[in-house]
Design a protein with these regions (language model features):
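Bacterial N-terminal signal peptides
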Residues: 7-16
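Alpha-helical scaffolding within the catalytic cores
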Residues: 103-112, 185-187, 206-216, 255-258
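Alpha/beta-hydrolase fold nucleophile elbow
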Residues: 163-177
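C-terminal catalytic histidine-bearing segment of alpha/beta-hydrolase fold enzymes
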Residues: 226-241, 245-305
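Short glycine-enriched nucleophile-adjacent loop
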Residues: 180-191
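Active-site machinery of serine-nucleophile hydrolases
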Residues: 85-88, 92-155
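A conserved short beta-strand
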Residues: 193-204
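A domain-start/cap signature at the N-terminus of enzymes
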Residues: 21-87, 252-257, 300-305
Length: 305
């Protein structure tokens, strides 16, 4: 069991530096709960593999602008109930995005609130505004274990909860687009795959199918894969379903708009084909919130006896 270590918004986001833009997010979400925007030693970046930046299609993305952001956003909703174990939903953004952009564009905080779930949202910075899926330190062995330890330590040091003795509960790993790669690495060698209760791929199954299947076979967590016709994930999604069918592993394949709450709650492997474009799959129909509602996370308000 892991415990803590001892030791106008659109204009602001468009013009501010990464640290300044992130800092201005905190008061913007105060009505919903407590947002902390901080920096982690264990955050994906900086990383030696991107010390000289990254070249994509002959264009160089320098390290200073794209691979030096160690920002991690942590949001605790009003009314969070302390139980001694904290459930986390950790979302990894895709290409050409940032922490501030992800919170704004996909309304993750608003969707968490709408779900009514007793969970903490965490959004670490990946490659900032770059065409890159590299997960930095979170791709290293035990990288996720170190990240969660620093996360718990931060919550403890900031006095977020009244009780000091708390540990990691269930963890949902969510990723849009290029966010798939860091999730696959976490499941494969992050050190705490057993804590990953669910994996959500928002038009993100581009590769690493073996790692996702290995996690599912070993830990029997819920895998939700929503895919589009033109986002580049259809072939891999259909190939994964074919593998499951060949080995007689049950799964649900349904149109995203027709999936019922009961279907989402009772199936372990779920493939949702959608008519939405790539960048709309997280927020347009509030799927992030719907996935949360059908998760095993506790509600903010306990059910009436």
């Amino acid at each position: 069991m892991l415990r803590p270590m001892t030791a106008p918004l659109a204009i602001l986001l468009a013009t501010a530096t990464p640290a300044l833009a992130a800092g201005n997010l905190e008061p913007a979400y105060a009505a919903h709960g407590r947002l902390m925007v901080t920096q982690f030693v264990s955050a994906p970046f900086p990383h030696p593999a991107r010390a000289t930046g990254h070249k994509y299609k002959a264009k160089l993305y320098p390290a200073k602008e794209h691979y030096s952001d160690s920002t991690v956003a942590i949001f605790i909703p009003h009314g969070f109930r302390e139980t001694g174990r904290v459930d986390f939903v950790i979302h990894f953004h895709g290409w050409h995005n940032s922490v501030a952009g992800t919170l704004r564009d996909y309304q993750l905080i608003e969707q968490l609130i709408a779900s009514g779930k007793n969970a903490v949202l965490v959004v670490p910075a990946g490659p900032r505004d770059a065409p890159d899926s590299f997960g930095g330190k979170l791709e290293e062995r035990d990288g996720f274990k170190h990240f969660l330890a620093e996360l718990l330590a931060t919550l403890q040091q900031r006095g977020v909860f009244q009780r000091k003795d708390f540990s990691v509960g269930r963890v949902i790993l969510s990723g849009h687009s290029g966010g798939y790669r860091v999730i696959a690495a976490i499941l494969d060698r992050g050190g705490l795959a057993k804590n990953a209760d669910e994996v959500w791929l928002f038009d993100a199954l581009y590769a690493e199918t073996d790692k996702f299947l290995a996690w599912s076979d070993r830990h029997h967590g819920r895998l939700l894969n929503i895919y589009t016709d033109h986002g580049g994930t259809k072939d891999d999604s259909e190939a994964m379903m074919a593998r499951l069918k060949k080995r007689a592993t049950p799964f649900l394949a349904v149109e995203e708009a027709k999936a019922t709450t009961d279907e989402l709650k009772t199936n372990q492997l779920i493939f949702l084909h959608t008519d939405l474009p790539h960048n709309d799959v997280v927020e347009k129909r509030q799927e992030f919130s719907r996935f949360l509602k059908t998760s095993r996370f506790d509600d903010l308000k306990p059910a009436a006896p």
